[in-house]
Amino acid sequence: MGSRYIAVAALAAGTTLSAFSAQAAGDLNLICSADVVICEQMKGDFEKAHSDIKVNMVRLSSGETYAKIRAEARNPKTDIWWAGTGDPHLQAASENLTLEYKSPMLDQLQDWAKKQAESSGYKTVGVYAGALGWGYNTEIFKTKGFKEPKCWADLLDPAFKGEIQIANPNSSGTAYTALASLVQIMGEDQAYDYLKKLNANISQYTKSGSAPVKAAARGETAIGIVFMHDAVAQTAEGFPVKSVAPCEGTGYEIGSMSIVKGAKNLDNAKTWYDWALKPDVQSRMKDAKSFQLPSNKTAEIPKEAPRFEDIKLIDYDFKTYGDPAKRKELLERWDREISANAN
């Protein structure tokens, strides 16, 4: 059989959903919810390994992807969704938006990755994991005489007014994980009281989860609340960024992967799914400064990756906070009490 060809959508910040939709009859329609650099690397590596499959890919945050897949449920334009926090993947699974698939690679995965699959009825699977924290610009801290924030409580210091960025939890899985983590650490009412106080120090709620620490790296803000591996990536790029795991404890993500129910290129989606769980593929993620913990047991763990054993992790309740009703409840309250009063 000859090779099949489609026009490949440009993967860049300006890539539009309309461009994606217009080319949705191709060999594999993929949404990537990781950083654009690893998205590009994964796309290129897959096409080298499977030269007869051309990938039409768009980069979207996980909250945006969940909303898109939900809106297109009657006429899916996406085949597979790779990466992004696990909560929206679980929400999609619970709404029957994604397809049950038991990969032959399952036995090679870490327990937390397999548990993610089992809890969703095998409608999603863990591909990497990473803990929540923040990164701060050491040069700004030195210049302004700031004290290192070691705990969630420290971020409320009035000295940090206008010096912190975090993403919007409506669009960002990172920020939703932060919201859900604080609710689990403090209790819901106390968490929203905390977020109201923190709001005074927030200069911007970004669309993308990793954007806050990239802004800190560029000197545009002092602190970015992100997954710690995103902060480490900026340090590895040579920026003056130091990573912090909060002293009270923190949540974590299980970055996940799901096949969309009704995928028009199902066989190719399964090919990507199995390929993305291979140890050599996950070991290469560090080449894109992607320093998460890989889900394959034999994949190489990047030396830069923040290790779970060094971090005070909460027993994050993925089932509860991956429920669509709970997500809706938390986000509506965030919109009323936090977003409505944003600076």
Where are these regions (language model features)?
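Early extracytoplasmic/lumenal segment of secretory-pathway proteins
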Residues: 25-91
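Extracytoplasmic ligand-binding site segments that recognize negatively charged/polar headgroups
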Residues: 33-40, 77-220
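Conserved C-terminal helix/tail region of periplasmic/extracytoplasmic solute-binding proteins
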Residues: 316-343
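Periplasmic-binding protein-like
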Residues: 111, 130, 194-199, 205-206, ...
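Mature extracytoplasmic/periplasmic domains
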Residues: 255-318
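Sec/Tat signal peptide C-region and signal peptidase I cleavage site
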Residues: 18-24
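Bacterial N-terminal signal peptides
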Residues: 7-18
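A ligand-binding cleft/hinge motif common to bilobed small-molecule-binding domains
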Residues: 87-91, 217, 222-240
